[in-house]
Amino acid sequence: MNQSYGRLVSRAAIAATAMASLLLLIKIFAWWYTGSVSILAALVDSLVDIGASLTNLLVVRYSLQPADDNHSFGHGKAESLAALAQSMFISGSALFLFLTGIQHLVSPTPMTDPGVGVIVTIVALICTIILVSFQRWVVRRTQSQAVRADMLHYQSDVMMNGAILLALGLSWYGWHRADALFALGIGIYILYSALRMGYEAVQSLLDRALPDEERQEIIGIVTSWPGVSGAHDLRTRQSGPTRFIQIHLEMEDSLPLVQAHMVADQVEQAILRRFPGSDVIIHQDPCSVVPREGKRSMLS
């Protein structure tokens, strides 16, 4: 799984970097030719795209390194750091776009040839849609937080390019302030996306539990297993592609230790079949000691 995960995530990062570099060159020409502030906004965003995607590529490769003596749980948290770094990159670009939009709203400048901007924006829109479709496929296969953050970023680019097309079309009819207004709107949306990305990254770094649906599945597997009377103290988190699952099984006092160990192994294998590549730790408790120990919430 790790080899497939690494291959797909690396390809997604390389594709994003290459696409952003190509679009940057196209947008530099379009901005120089038209003077459109909306295209300038898209140009700045492409610069951020390159920085963010390069960061993703480097960090993802680091996160795929196996566990070592100093990092017993692996390097998967590096993906969350990459997503957090992306949110900072994007917030900076959003602030720049917002300030630029205000400046051009106060002093609008007519574009020299909106038609060139329209052609460039359509090309950028098509390329970005293709990239987002590939990234969405990779996310479905890997659940990579870094690629998901990159995908959300490029999804905002799709909306940006659509808004730029509208702005250029309105500028054709003399609505020159429309260009600046759309730049302001784009800046606000990008900032919202950045804050959402940053929140998700911080939650991962703080070891947020797995989604409720996955925890319910784990509970269902465990409590339905023959020889298991109950379960408690389920603890879960995720680091990169690896889920970490810990749970206490409740078993009859009279069950021999060897048999209890065998049941726990079977439960572990059942969980791994459902969630391949997970790190599972199971503790066995006699039913008689559970009330004295006290139970934490199952969905912890």
From Swiss-Prot:
Q: Where are the transmembrane segments?
A: 12-32, 39-59, 82-102, 114-134, 156-176, 178-198
Kindly indicate whether the keyword Isomerase belongs to this entry: no
Listed InterPro entries: Cation_efflux, Cation_efflux_CTD, Cation_efflux_CTD_sf, Cation_efflux_FieF, Cation_efflux_TMD_sf, CDF_Transporter
Which processes are annotated in GO (biological process)? Answer: intracellular zinc ion homeostasis
- The family this protein is said to belong to: Belongs to the cation diffusion facilitator (CDF) transporter (TC 2.A.4) family. FieF subfamily.
Q: Sorted alphabetically, which NCBIfam families does this protein's record hold?
A: CDF (TIGR01297), PRK09509.1 (NF007064)
Q: Which HAMAP family match?
A: Cation_efflux_FieF
Name of protein = Cation-efflux pump FieF
Species of provenance:
Shigella flexneri serotype 5b (strain 8401)
* Organism placement in taxonomy: Bacteria, Pseudomonadati, Pseudomonadota, Gammaproteobacteria, Enterobacterales
